[in-house]
A protein has these predicted regions:
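Structured adenosyl-cofactor binding patch, chiefly the S-adenosyl-L-methionine
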Residues: 9-13, 24-41, 101-139
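Active-site/ligand-binding-proximal alpha/beta "capping" segment
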Residues: 68-117
Length: 139
């Protein structure tokens, strides 16, 4: 359900595409399609296959994208301070394990949603909604 939610949220906040990597849920599964409320067919969903790292390098080097790693890390830049300088891509990791160190190392910036109290994480779709809302409003 997270994949469908992320696609729906991305479409709602004006993303131009959703890129998936190896190990991602199938964005065209019946469940993801249902949760996306049809947005999977309105927003390009690009499956990068087995080499997401190469795709990310291509986005940065050939298309001047600024890559943002979204992390649970107090040392990362707080989301409210993040301002993209142009085209950007937000990377969301697996809900349990987060982004791999390889993908994080390819990113230009590391950003986080500051958490309070005993709450240490959010559902990946909820977090994606917060990040995408912020980026939609600072562009």
């Amino acid at each position: 359900e997270n994949m469908g939610s992320i696609i729906r949220i991305a479409a709602g906040f004006g993303a131009t595409a959703v890129l998936t990597g190896q190990g991602s849920c199938d964005p065209f599964s019946r469940r993801a399609l249902r949760v996306s409320m049809g947005n999977t067919f309105c927003l390009p969903v690009i499956e990068s296959g087995t080499d997401l790292a190469a795709t990310l390098r291509q986005l940065r080097e050939q298309h001047s994208f600024e890559l943002f790693a979204t992390l649970l890390d107090e040392s990362a830049e707080p989301l409210h301070q993040a301002r993209p300088s142009g085209n950007c891509a937000l990377l969301f990791g697996h809900e349990d394990s987060g982004l791999t160190s390889e993908w994080t190392s390819l990113c230009d910036r590391r950003i986080t949603i500051p958490m309070h109290g005993d709450t240490d994480s959010l559902n990946v779709a909820v977090a994606a909604g917060i990040f995408l809302h912020h980026f939609a409003n600072v562009r």
